[in-house]
Amino acid sequence: MTGSVSGEEGLSEKAYRLGVEYEKRYHNCAFSTVKALSDALNLGWDWPIDKVYGLAGGVGLTGEGSCGALSGGALILTLLCSPEMRYESISREERYKVYGIVSELAKKFQMEYGGCTCRRVQEKVLGRSFNLWDPEEHEGFVKAGGHEDDKCPSVVGNSAKWVVEILSANNYFEDKRG
């Protein structure tokens, strides 16, 4: 990738746009975030993309865990920013560098949505949270616009955009230019 800040800004907007598009199409925040980033960054990954769907809706649709868009973004940051070695071989300093990078994404969720859980994000963007396991509640989520542009798709778009911005701020693209 040739590198200019404007190119990286273009990548963040592409990641946002793909995140919105994919969440509207697939109705899965974790999958859509990882796929948007894989496609925007030309990672060429099939795995782990197809294996993250269980993280959606606050992990297994419980609402209690991290927002799936946050989980998907955290996964990509960890995969791209970790040293090329097994966990057991990574030094404490290297692990804490990655923890710090991932925490930047969590802080953005806290600032924008008031927290990191699916419930908290739903409350912010939908005005209340929904039990996605209950058919009536799930229908209420859809009727409240859960899959419309300015709701969960925008959360996925923001997460994907923020990941690109965090990668840029941590010289990921500079390192790739060599």
Enumerate the predicted regions with their spans.
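Acidic-glycine-rich active-site phosphate/pyrophosphate-binding loop
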Residues: 3-9, 37-55, 131-136
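A short glycine/serine-rich beta->alpha loop
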Residues: 16-24, 56-65, 92, 143-148
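Short cysteine clusters
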Residues: 29, 67, 118
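Conserved phosphate/anionic-ligand binding catalytic regions in large, soluble enzymes, centered on
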Residues: 61-75
